[in-house]
Design a protein with these regions (language model features):
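Aromatic- and acidic-residue-enriched carbohydrate-binding clefts of CAZyme catalytic domains
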Residues: 1-28, 218
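Alpha-helical scaffold elements lining the catalytic groove of polysaccharide deacetylases
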Residues: 28-40
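Active-site-proximal helices and loops of the catalytic beta/alpha 8
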Residues: 40-42, 46-154, 159, 177-179, ...
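Conserved interdomain hinge at the start of the Helicase C-terminal
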Residues: 182-184
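Substrate-binding cleft of carbohydrate-active enzyme catalytic domains
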Residues: 1, 32, 45
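Short, solvent-exposed helix-loop connector elements
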Residues: 172-176
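Acidic/polar loop patches that form or flank catalytic/metal-binding clefts of enzymes
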Residues: 84, 195-202
Length: 223
């Protein structure tokens, strides 16, 4: 949506097209449906007493509706947090989606976005940090280059930071025996800016790659 070169036809496909063959879209431009979805969300928050929601594939929904949805939910629950999955390999695009972004002509009202740029960088950087490679193209310097762009985010402290999740291969790969990389990465995750997310199983070194399938990286926690 932020691409100034994108034709209107592609924008409509992104927002109005089905996400998958078994995932039909709801017409969130319909005011009756929009009101139902907002009220239904508020009801479930009240009923379940949850503290936050991760909104999957946030950019694929109707922008104006999602901005209204975020605002009305926050009006009801000021301390509630909404995390939008805006999956972009560069932080510049993720920053566009955060609330009060100077790059966005309108306001998304989305408090927290996911920092996929830092995730992918960590997966590479900590591997380099345990090797003999040196220089400005290896190791932790890659991470420095990412967080040096934090001026793009309206609020870097409300960015979700993570090493892996249910859509990615686990940070601890199968057969890996070097715990130094793992410990260093966890230490960074828990001390850098933003809100740390730890995927279940990380604490017991669960492993698995995306190539093995989602069923492997989403294996039940043992016990």
């Amino acid at each position: 949506l932020m691409d100034v070169h994108a034709p209107q036809s592609e924008r409509e496909i992104l927002v109005n097209g089905w996400f998958g063959r078994g995932m039909p879209d709801l017409n969130q431009k319909n005011r009756h449906l929009a009101r139902y979805l907002i009220q239904n969300s508020i009801w479930w928050i009240e009923y379940s007493r949850i503290d936050g929601i991760r909104q999957d594939t946030h950019p694929y929904a109707d922008y104006d509706f999602m901005a209204t949805w975020c605002k009305e939910v926050e009006n009801e629950y000021p301390d509630f947090n909404i995390v939008g999955e805006a999956w972009y390999p560069r932080g510049t695009a993720s920053a566009w989606w955060q609330r009060d972004s100077k790059m966005n002509e309108s306001n998304s009202n989305l408090k927290t976005v996911m920092d996929f740029d830092l995730t992918f960088t960590c997966q590479k950087a900590f591997g380099d940090a345990c090797s003999s490679r040196e220089g400005f193209e290896a190791g932790l310097f890659k991470i420095y280059e990412v967080i040096a762009q934090d001026f793009l985010f309206p609020d870097p402290n409300n960015v979700l930071v993570f090493l892996d999740n249910h859509d990615l291969g686990r940070f601890m790969q199968k057969g890996e025996s070097d715990l130094r990389r793992y410990k260093q990465a966890i230490a960074f995750l828990l001390t850098t800016r933003g809100i740390p997310q730890i995927y279940y199983g990380t604490e017991i070194l669960m492993s698995g790659t995306k190539a093995e399938g989602d069923g492997i990286i989403r294996t039940d926690f043992p016990g």
